[in-house]
Amino acid sequence: MASFEQMRANVGKLLRGIDRYNPENLATLERYVETQAKENAYDLEANLAVLKLYQFNPAFFQTTVTAQVLLKALTNLPHTDFTLCKCMIDQAHQEDRPIRQILYLGDLLETCHFQSFWQALDENLDLIDGVTGFEDSVRKFICHVVGITYQHIDRWLLAEMLGDLSEPQLRVWMSKYGWIESENGKIFVCNQEENIKPKNIVEKIDFDSVSGIMASSQ
């Protein structure tokens, strides 16, 4: 199978041309989705084109490919890719087992039920077979949420939220985000007050602008 970069240029031409929604291109686009999953790469535009082709050609619908598209969208949280993809899947197919489970996982992530997410994922690890880097991509999203929510967080809680990480694994993520261990098992995330940057808005109004308004109001 060609690499992601090799396929990207060819797929880009397909998406720009009049054949964007030609069902004969589905096989190429589906292989591209599989390549994204294997190589931890991502192309939202191409993946949305796949889902649109499934809408236009229901007989060609592939549950496995759709599941991979959804999983790749989850790796790009907090962007709204997952919601976009979900809206393009009809209700009947949303009830298919892998798709239903992935939608549930997405709901847990979007509502920040992180411990429940890892528990549900552990019970359905087959869902992410062939999706390289999925768990670490989710951890990046969780760290993003922690970074904008907490000043201090219990060490045990952070480890749980990141999927019951071991001590060395947790230290890697703390180092990545510059989080420092403080006393009593707490981790210093950041000073939220320093993140609030008020803006002073100064608007200059010259006399000509005011005189025009005054004249029109008379």
Curated annotation (Swiss-Prot):
GO BP annotations listed: formation of cytoplasmic translation initiation complex; regulation of translational initiation; translational initiation
Alphabetical list of PROSITE patterns matching this protein: PCI (PS50250)
MF terms in GO: ribosome binding; RNA binding; translation initiation factor activity
Keyword vocabulary terms for this entry: Cytoplasm, Initiation factor, Nucleus, Protein biosynthesis
Gene Ontology CC: eukaryotic 43S preinitiation complex; eukaryotic 48S preinitiation complex; eukaryotic translation initiation factor 3 complex; nucleus
InterPro entries recorded: ARM-type_fold (IPR016024), CSN8_PSD8_EIF3K (IPR033464), eIF3k (IPR009374), PCI_dom (IPR000717), Transl_init_fac_sub12_N_euk (IPR016020), WH-like_DNA-bd_sf (IPR036388), WH_DNA-bd_sf (IPR036390)
Subcellular location(s) of the protein: Nucleus; Cytoplasm
PCI domain boundaries: 42-204
Domain of life: Eukaryota
Pfam families: CSN8_PSD8_EIF3K
Entry-linked SUPFAM superfamilies: ARM repeat, Winged helix' DNA-binding domain
Assembly: Component of the eukaryotic translation initiation factor 3 (eIF-3) complex, which is composed of 13 subunits: eif3a, eif3b, eif3c, eif3d, eif3e, eif3f, eif3g, eif3h, eif3i, eif3j, eif3k, eif3l and eif3m.
Family, similarity comment: Belongs to the eIF-3 subunit K family.
Known function: Component of the eukaryotic translation initiation factor 3 (eIF-3) complex, which is involved in protein synthesis of a specialized repertoire of mRNAs and, together with other initiation factors, stimulates binding of mRNA and methionyl-tRNAi to the 40S ribosome. The eIF-3 complex specifically targets and initiates translation of a subset of mRNAs involved in cell proliferation.
Name of protein: Eukaryotic translation initiation factor 3 subunit K
Organism for this UniProt entry: Xenopus laevis
Gene (UniProt): eif3k
